[in-house]
């Protein structure tokens, strides 16, 4: 029962007052004529015979031949949602094919007296209530067909096919349409399935009957339809006949119901159809994970399930019949992979930059090695794991390597470099291209990064990650001005290889004074020139002053460039005023580098910010507590500890509400310290502060 609805839009009125409905075998299409006759011609067109085609600006004779139909200056628009147009007066389908309707869209009184309309059959139950309510609310509104077409994104067809108007269509159109629709798969779906009724894809013109509403298909596919060929009535009866009969029975029962109840029934059908069990797929998450991720593959893999288990959409993916299973550690977690430990522990991965000569051992290898050392060489194992705090012992393992030119420069001074750095060894390097200081270590143990143990080994000399570049400040900025790229490349060579570069600039204050003096001389010369009008001859400068003038750096620019180099060149700049100042500070630097390998603050970097030092006994711990809480002096803390040697003894008197006095009969502590101690011992809130 597909038909072509031909809408003729008047140019003057711009409304939907004149509408012509013509049955045809194609999809529902809208033909909006760019020009139309005026209202007088429209009235004469309604009185004309049923064989007349839609009116045009020029009145022509009409015949039944398809070629004589004038469709010039018309735009053919495909509108699959033509039911949204509220048309209140339509002609009966059984009277004639080309009958013309002369009624207004806003006339509801005449619509009540008409017989059953064509669009009433086309519109389904769920849409009829919307049309009725929308017609009451917007009875005075007018619809523009072009706006409706643009609203639904309908595109115009360049070559519209002519409308075939002949007598054979009257007898064959209905039977042909019914047979096509009954064979379509749309007749097997409920009327309230909107996704099938109005697909998101564009309308296909090859098979137009599949785009019709489901109500048309269900009405025309009934077994009582006499216009349907006999050969196609039994087609598909094995799979869908029962569903068709149930649906047609429900349609017959709903004919006498009002439209509001019809919509309620249609919505209930939609709810029933939507509550069907969805198609579920059992996911195996191990196929979605990377094979290299050995930690999560065994843990997150979906367990195998029986084929009789049906999961609905409300059940979780990881649901299992046995919810209370015994917690088991994954095999990959017990394997103790060194690389896995390196990646998961952040502080362990950073130890390589500070602790030289180390290796990653598994837990089993570590246990076997410790068991063997405790049997064979127990004293050596204890010795290499002992933490030393003496600076002399820390320097005993160090070797300081100077470049030849730098070592010769430091030996010119009055101090003995070897004596100041003893017991460290001072030696000269073979490369004199850069003023470089390297720190070497004599290692007799190897460090276990994974288990935090030192194992005795054969002596070996390794290089520390810290090195020093020593430059005179003026020479450095001369290279920075003339050979900046080469200087940057040399410094970045070390920092890219994981070295911590310390850039020492000597005589930086002397350079600042030379730059300031040069700027002051230039300023005085400009002032005297403006006052006297004659240029005064500059005083002869020394060779070093002339070299400073060639730098072209101001005092303010010098500070800015130092900050830029420190930030962008990945170095740490340290300035000294003379060579002797650096030589005197070098022993302390060597001691710090010597302690670095066994420093607990570096090995336990995660807790280094706490800055907590352990005490020898409980009495010393209580004494440090007094100092941290009330800044109590050491002598006064000793008096308190002599009477209360432990926390328990002090807590007993605090609970009693009285404290002992000292030997002179005075208070042991001030009132503020007593309040803080009382709060420390009795407070139950861990987030509370001691004021």
Swiss-Prot record:
Source domain of life: Eukaryota
Description of pH dependence: Optimum pH is 8.0 for cleavage of a 3'-flap structure.
Residues found modified as Phosphoserine: 48-49, 61
A Gene Ontology molecular function term of the record: metal ion binding
Signal peptide range in chain numbering: none
Main location: nucleus
Lipoprotein recorded as keyword: no
Biased composition (Basic and acidic residues): 203-214
Chain segments annotated as coiled-coil in the UniProt record: 364-391, 507-529
InterPro entries registered for this protein in UniProt: ERCC4_domain, Mms4/EME1/EME2
UniProt cross-references to Pfam families, sorted A to Z: ERCC4
Designated name of the protein: Crossover junction endonuclease MMS4
Organism of origin: Saccharomyces cerevisiae (strain ATCC 204508 / S288c) (Baker's yeast)
């Amino acid at each position: 029962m597909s038909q072509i609805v031909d809408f003729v839009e008047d140019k003057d009125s711009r409304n939907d007052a004149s509408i012509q409905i013509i049955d045809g075998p194609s999809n529902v299409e809208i033909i909006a004529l760019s020009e139309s006759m005026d209202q007088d011609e429209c009235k004469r067109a309604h009185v004309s015979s049923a064989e007349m085609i839609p009116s045009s600006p020029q009145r022509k004779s009409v015949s039944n031949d398809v070629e004589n139909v004038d469709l010039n200056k018309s735009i053919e628009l495909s509108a699959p949602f033509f039911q949204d147009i509220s048309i209140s007066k339509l002609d009966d389908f059984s009277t004639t094919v080309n009958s013309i309707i002369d009624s207004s869209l806003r006339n509801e009184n005449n619509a009540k007296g008409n017989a059953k309309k064509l669009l009433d059959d086309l519109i389904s139950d769920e849409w009829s209530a919307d049309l009725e309510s929308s017609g009451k609310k917007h009875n005075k509104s007018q619809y523009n067909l072009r706006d409706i077409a643009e609203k639904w994104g309908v595109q115009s067809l360049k070559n519209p096919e002519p409308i075939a108007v002949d007598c054979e269509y009257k007898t064959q159109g209905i039977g042909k349409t019914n047979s096509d629709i009954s064979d379509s798969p749309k007749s097997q779906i409920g009327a309230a399935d909107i996704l099938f009724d109005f697909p998101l894809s564009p309308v296909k013109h090859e098979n137009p009957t599949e785009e019709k509403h489901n109500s048309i298909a269900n009405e025309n596919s009934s077994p009582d339809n006499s216009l349907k060929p006999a050969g196609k009535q039994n087609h598909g009866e094995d799979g869908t006949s029962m569903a068709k009969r149930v649906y047609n029975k429900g349609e017959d029962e709903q004919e006498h119901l009002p439209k509001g109840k019809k919509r309620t029934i249609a919505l209930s059908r939609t709810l029933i159809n939507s509550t069907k069990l969805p198609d579920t797929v059992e996911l195996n998450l191990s196929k979605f994970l990377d094979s290299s991720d050995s930690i999560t593959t065994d843990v997150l893999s979906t367990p195998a399930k029986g084929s009789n288990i049906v999961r609905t959409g409300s059940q979780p993916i990881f649901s299992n019949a046995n919810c209370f299973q015994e917690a088991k550690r994954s095999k990959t977690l017990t394997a103790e992979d060194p690389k896995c430990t390196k990646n998961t522990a952040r502080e362990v991965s950073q130890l390589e930059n500070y602790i030289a000569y180390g290796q990653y051992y598994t837990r089993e290898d570590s246990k076997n090695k410790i068991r063997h050392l405790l049997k064979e060489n127990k004293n050596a194992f204890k010795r290499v794991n002992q933490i030393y705090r003496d600076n002399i012992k820390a320097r005993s393992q160090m070797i300081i390597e100077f470049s030849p030119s730098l070592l010769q420069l430091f030996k010119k001074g009055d101090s003995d470099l070897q004596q100041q750095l003893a017991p460290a060894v001072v030696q000269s390097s073979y490369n004199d291209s850069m003023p470089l200081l390297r720190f070497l270590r004599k290692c007799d143990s190897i460090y276990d990064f994974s288990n935090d143990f030192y194992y005795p080994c054969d002596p070996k000399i390794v290089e520390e990650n810290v090195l020093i570049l020593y430059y005179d400040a003026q020479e450095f900025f001369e290279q920075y001005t003339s050979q900046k790229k080469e200087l940057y490349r040399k410094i970045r060579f070390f920092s890219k290889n994981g070295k911590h570069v310390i850039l020492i600039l000597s005589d930086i204050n002397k350079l600042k004074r030379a730059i300031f003096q040069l700027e002051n001389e230039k300023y005085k010369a400009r002032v005297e020139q403006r006052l006297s009008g004659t240029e005064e001859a500059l005083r002869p400068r020394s060779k070093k002053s002339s070299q400073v003038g060639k730098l072209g750096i101001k005092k303010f620019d010098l500070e800015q460039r130092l900050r830029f180099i420190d930030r962008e060149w990945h170095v740490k700049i340290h300035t000294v005023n003379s060579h002797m100042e650096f030589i005197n500070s070098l022993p302390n630097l060597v001691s710090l580098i010597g302690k670095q390998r066994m420093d607990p603050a570096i090995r336990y970097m995660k807790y280094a910010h706490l800055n907590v030092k352990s005490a020898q006994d409980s009495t010393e711990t209580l004494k440090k507590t007094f100092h941290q809480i009330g800044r109590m002096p050491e002598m006064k803390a000793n008096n308190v500890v002599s009477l209360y040697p432990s926390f328990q003894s002090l807590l007993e008197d605090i609970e009693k509400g009285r404290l002992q006095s000292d030997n002179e009969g005075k208070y042991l502590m001030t009132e503020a310290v007593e309040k803080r101690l009382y709060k420390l011992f009795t407070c139950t809130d861990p987030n509370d502060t001691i004021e």
